[in-house]
Amino acid sequence: MANVSSPDRKAPLERYRNFGIAAHIDGGKTTLSERILFYTGMIHKIGEVHDGAATTDWMEQEQERGITITSAAVTTNWKQLPSEGCCKLFENENFQLNVIDTPGHVDFTAEVERSLRVLDGAIVVFCGVAGVQPQTQTVWRQATKYNVPRICFVNKMDRVGANFDNVLNDIRTKLGANAAPILIPIGSEDSLHGQIDVVNQKAIIYADNDRMGSTYTVEELPAELKDKAAEALEDLKSRVADVDDELAELYLMEEPIDAPTLKADIRRACIANKFVPIAGGSAFKNKGIQALLDAVVDYLPSLLEAKAAVVTSTVSNGLDENGYETFETKVLEPSDDDKPVALAFKLWADKFVGSLVFIRVYTGVIHKGDTVYNPRTRKRERVGRLLQIQANVHTDVDAVYSGDIAAIVGLKNATTGDTLATDDFDYTLEPPTFPDTVISMAVEPLTKGDQEKMSNALQRLSAEDPTFRVKTDEETGQTIIAGMGELHLDIIVDRLRREFKVEANTGKPQIAYRETITKSADRVQGKLVKQSGGRGQYGDVVIAMRPGERGTGLKIANKIVGGAIPKEYMNAVYAGLNEAMNSGCVAGYPVEDVEVDVIDGSYHEVDSNENAFKMAAIFAMKNAFAKCGPVLLEPIMSVEVVTPAENQGDIMGDLNRRRAAVNNMEHRGTECILSASVPLAEMFGYSTDIRTLSKGLASYSMEPSHFEQVPPNLVAQIVKARGGAAK
């Protein structure tokens, strides 16, 4: 299908830029988002995060705490204005920018994950003082996972201690990026007043008398900056030539490389994820944003150049030689002339509009009143309203087009990760994947009359947030909520009170342990036989089990031969195998990373049914867990501590007492930066302890890293606290 742009859309396919803004907490993402809206003319007054007035921080909790909690989508426009003597790839062309501002706190990493899944590019923001921080590394991995091209913005170059070269070195060494500057700050701290445009070898100078940063001039480089600019240009050419054959040929032959050629090569390398352009400035001081927007247009992909959207059939093609099911895939081309296909990437309950389903349209056009088909539920639903989103402000539109990010009102059965299409489209887009929860706690309403109200509210919140889970403890009857950290659950409880008018008591936070296996078992049987007159129950499943690779969950291969288990019962077998993973045999925690082959079984012509085979599969899994060396896993956190050098010894000693493995230590000026891997179980109360040890001068951040086996000497007390070994 050709890439066709409808005449009704606001901008053609080639003039769309869908990108997100991501960083470590306090990197300045929302401040940058606010400036983008200001300089593109979407807003006419800048709101500051510390005043609770930023456009994209619209939740009460965001305004009170000064942090971003939920991703916010906005749509605006940008036109590259010509500058004398400067090359810009798309002068005087109007571009539509769909921008998502994402949270920086690790507890809300799901918002970053689902945003990067549907975006074509990203600006990754770095603090000019702190450089690469733990959540920056997580964001970088997420962008790499979804093959998202990115531009780096080194922010806060006005702050004391800001060092552009240090951050550049961090990006190259800690993130492994092939990166080079395209816009270098002129000055730093109080003297920050412009940028070197490396490609054009010009100076962008901001007017001293314009605090809003709207007035600047493009000038010849002053003599004292010419050598620095020339060295940066040579480094830029060299690094792009390393990954771009067209530029490499010119570079090696020492042919002249003009600005249009170099920009086109940078664009090609950036879109191919082989090169990362870096810009520096200060969002808070309104310096460097217009040139950054030009870079977004110049170097991030259009809809026609973005990574291809691949859909996978929901109907199996049969088994491969290893017993795994295979499915047909095909590529979707962005076009307004094709049947629509969209991905639901977020749900949100708006108190005025109702339930919103946020979508990214990959191809086709969806109109208000259309019926969309969901391959997961195999149900059709009517599109009641279509909304263009500007943070928390919604505007009704009649249609959304290929590449648009919008919201649908009226869908009752859609959830995060669902594909929405027309007709019987039995293909699905890849859904975003989310990390496991690491912390849980009991919650109960203050009054028994609010129990049902609380349950409904928690279910609604869990539908919105895939990293928030709710379950009932079968032994105690308590409601258990689980999430990514204490702040995450604190916000949930606060939303219960504010939005749903439910006051709740909470228990002490608990670690969300996991279980896995360390050995293999070749043949383990699970059997259900109830035959005492009348129609009975008969299911017989035999499996082989072995440890899987970390992070793979459960992999099932069907190696049944000769019809030992009829095909009509295999879905029930799969359901039982998956259900058994919810509770291991060490302490009843969920099980991870197991490979299972279904190798044999038997059935009864009369007494066999789906439930019998599901139960037999569960029994087989439980029996196999016990034989395969089950162990307990605990969440390990990546922790970074920034402390005055004189407190380094005390901080190190305290980390060692917390079973930490210190991975790296570096000194920057009078500060020491410690990077360590620490069990989450040892980090409760750390905020208070680190303040005491450093007289309030040290700070830390942490994020989930991985799961590791609990030391044998600690397993017994964890099992005891859980209430004994699993039955």
What are these regions (language model features)?
Residues M1-K727:
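Structural and coupling elements of P-loop NTPases
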